[in-house]
Every structure is written in structure tokens, then in C-alpha cells.
Amino acid sequence: DYVRIVLDGLSGDERVLQHAINRTVSRVHQSMEAFIHNMNTIHSRGGNQVVFSSVNYGTDTSAEGRCIIREMLTSTYRGVGSGGTAIFPIQIWKKKRGVNYLPQDPNYDLYVFACKVSARRFFPNFINLDATFNRHELWKAGDPERFRYETATMGCRTRVFENRFGEKTSIGRGNLSFSTINIVRLAIECMDISEREERIRTFFSKLDELLELTALQLHRRFEFQKTARAKQFPLLMSSLWVGAEKLKPEDTIESVINQGTLGIGFIGLAECLVALTGKHHAEDPAAQQLGIRIITRFRDKANEFSERWQHNYSVLATPAE
């Protein structure tokens, strides 16, 4: 393992090797500090914004990978400038049994450290790779490229994994666009209806209309996005997006970006339930079941839109931070 150790008491080749490791760890730490600094200062996004960046880690058990993870966490824990919390990149810890979750797992020590860092800096967030919907049938513990079969998220909420048009993976893909539905407003518009079941029926009717509009808006935006040519994105279309290596400079990017996702977001579920029932999902089992019905409607409609428009529609909970 690449860990910085005091050289006192070491001699010969052992001292030389540890000196080299100490120098390497110091350089890696500086690199992680620089990475975090750059991600919070490079204004290269549209409208001169800081790039919304995210990084998923935690399952690399090699000495080099563990060193990078440890120094990334250390830099995050110490903060930037005078100790402030860096907003970017959004950091996501990939939790996996046999890798970093149980005390006997090789990266368990880093998982414990990640929990400590998260308690202080709110990062990293955590994704459970053991959840049934996050498992990949091709994942094997001894596979050096198992990361290809591990779910990753963009930011703290946008899951990119299933793919109707290619391999199920997060590698080489991303979210193209997303629109959020304010379901609180829909619920408030129904509050004047005194009969509970009729109030809920009206809410779902309004929700269905808005879901249709949202899906159409995302489709039409994609129709514009797909007209771009590969030469307009020399970095993305040279080595990053899956399938981009097959494109010629004058080719449109449609076949490549359609492997990404179009996100339909929702916001305000708890407040929505209060407006409809008087209680939120943590206060009443009936409200909890209604909340599940609402999100299920989002997912069912997303599946329907995926068939109709031939895209990867996804559902996400918009944090609105």
C-alpha cells in the first residue's frame, strides 16, 4: 500500500523504497488538491459557469487506486482555502460488499474514512452497488475492469446505467437534458377539492398532462441536439462518449448521444403529500403509499415515453440545492 511513513529507523533498500513512496504520496496529494481547485475555478460551462462535475470512486483495491482515493478524501476533509467546503466535484462513494463495506473487505478502512469525511464535508454521497437494481450480471470481483459494470451517478441524483441502445454501463454515457416538475404546485391547485379521492384523481390527471408535455419538450430538445456534428466536440467525440470513435468529423452525433438519458425530475414530494392528505410520507402509512404511487406513475410514464420516442427516459429526484 502507498502510505506515507516516517523514515526514522529504516535503512538500505527499505529506506529508499519508502522515500520514493512518500514522495509519490505527496505528489498524489498535491494533484488531488489541484483537481479540486480546478473543478471549482474553471468557468468553461455555458454562461461562464463552473463545470458541474462529479466523480465516483471507492472500489479500486489496487495500491495506486487506494492511494488516489485516500488523498482525495484527505484533501476533501481538510477543505480548500481557509478550510472551506468545496462544492465540486460532487463525490460519490460506491459501496460494495466484498470490496469496501465489511471489516474484512480490502477497502473497508477507506469506507470508514469516507464516512468521517462525509460527516464533516457532506461529501462523498453514497451509492449502494448491492441494491438489486444496481447489480450487473457481468460484475466479477477478480475482473480488473469490473468498474464497467458498476453503477455511477452524475451529481448526487442522476443515475445512468440501463441502456436501450447498447451496453448497460455508466462508462461513456451521460444525461443529455432534464426538466423538473413541481408537483407541489399541482397538489396546491387541487386543494380546493373537498373529497379526498377526487382530489387525488385530479392531481394525477394534471400530472399526466405535465408528464406528456415534459417528455415532448425533452424529445424536441434532443431533435435539436442531435443535429450537431462530431467535429464540434473534439474531446467528447474522440475518446469519451461510447461509440464516438466510429463517427467521422461531419457525422451527426445522434447515434452516440441517444445512448445517454433524458431526465424527468420531480420536486417537493413531502409537501405535495401534505397538500393532498394533510400529512407527509414519514407521518402516515397512507401518505407513504400515495407517494409511492406518484413516483411509480413517473417511472411507468418514463417507460412509455422511452418506447414512443425511442430514448432513454429516466426519473430523478431534483434536490434544488
Q: Which positions does each model-derived feature cover?
A:
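Conserved catalytic cores of very large enzyme subunits
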Residues: D1-Q259, K279-H280, D284-E321
